[in-house]
């Protein structure tokens, strides 16, 4: 009986803890500088505005500091999927599209990159 209670308890813990853990690893991120650039582009003195979906998507991304992004890029720059020297916009697009598209960025390989023609 005691073993049965332990197994049931383990399954209950796994049922509630594991989904939350999995979603924390798959969240999109955005840097503070990218948020500032977007807000400057669509500010009150400009003609652009973010629609309701873009605002909802922006609040769904995790804001990280620029040094964290730079460290991650430096760590993975020599990997098989190297970035190739292009400039990332400070935003990922794993689940949510690039909100920084208003400042000339587009999604490629789950990372938003600056369009050189913009």
From Swiss-Prot:
<feature type="propeptide">
    <location>
        <begin position="116"/>
        <end position="118"/>
    </location>
</feature>
<dbReference type="InterPro" id="IPR005535">
    <property type="entry name" value="Cyclotide"/>
</dbReference>
<comment type="function">
    <text>Probably participates in a plant defense mechanism.</text>
</comment>
<keyword id="KW-0960">Knottin</keyword>
<feature type="disulfide bond">
    <location>
        <begin position="93"/>
        <end position="107"/>
    </location>
</feature>
<dbReference type="GO" id="GO:0006952">
    <property type="term" value="P:defense response"/>
</dbReference>
<keyword id="KW-0611">Plant defense</keyword>
<feature type="cross-link" description="Cyclopeptide (Gly-Asn)">
    <location>
        <begin position="85"/>
        <end position="115"/>
    </location>
</feature>
<dbReference type="InterPro" id="IPR036146">
    <property type="entry name" value="Cyclotide_sf"/>
</dbReference>
<dbReference type="InterPro" id="IPR012323">
    <property type="entry name" value="Cyclotide_bracelet_CS"/>
</dbReference>
<keyword id="KW-0732">Signal</keyword>
<feature type="disulfide bond">
    <location>
        <begin position="98"/>
        <end position="112"/>
    </location>
</feature>
<keyword id="KW-1015">Disulfide bond</keyword>
<dbReference type="Pfam" id="PF03784">
    <property type="entry name" value="Cyclotide"/>
</dbReference>
<feature type="disulfide bond">
    <location>
        <begin position="89"/>
        <end position="105"/>
    </location>
</feature>
<feature type="signal peptide">
    <location>
        <begin position="1"/>
        <end position="22"/>
    </location>
</feature>
<feature type="propeptide">
    <location>
        <begin position="23"/>
        <end position="84"/>
    </location>
</feature>
<comment type="similarity">
    <text>Belongs to the cyclotide family. Bracelet subfamily.</text>
</comment>
<protein>
    <recommendedName>
        <fullName>Cycloviolacin-O11</fullName>
    </recommendedName>
</protein>
